[in-house]
Amino acid sequence: MTACLVEVGGELRAHGVRPDGLPWRVAVEVPDASGAHALAVPLRDQSIATSGDYRRYIEQAGRRYAHTLAPRTGKPLDNDLASVTVIHPECMLADGLATALGVLGAAAGADYAARHDLAALFILRGAAGHEVRATPAFAALLDRP
């Protein structure tokens, strides 16, 4: 097999290109119930993984409690991040990094990603809706043909 796009448990791995010679295109969801997409990402010989609190959570007394726990406190994360998406050559690392950057939070996660030249997309939840922030490495991937 010379080309394929494989999905396992929400993570995707692209090998080669589509039959028409173009990269595989993968949509990044807006983390709400709308089913809308924030953007489409071209993938060629890379993996993509997203970690967020918009699918697995409970709400109590108006607060959202995610399935991801903060390692220092053992409590559910409490930050403004709705999701983090990472593109990386290794699928397992993309998945682990997406979770780790989410645990760090928007500011510290973006700082870590920029220092390590990681392609990461942060979607933050705010009063006016969602805000999308991409690291320089992620933005560069969007500009590729």
Model-identified regions with their sequence ranges:
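Mature catalytic core of soluble alpha/beta enzymes
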Residues: M1-P145
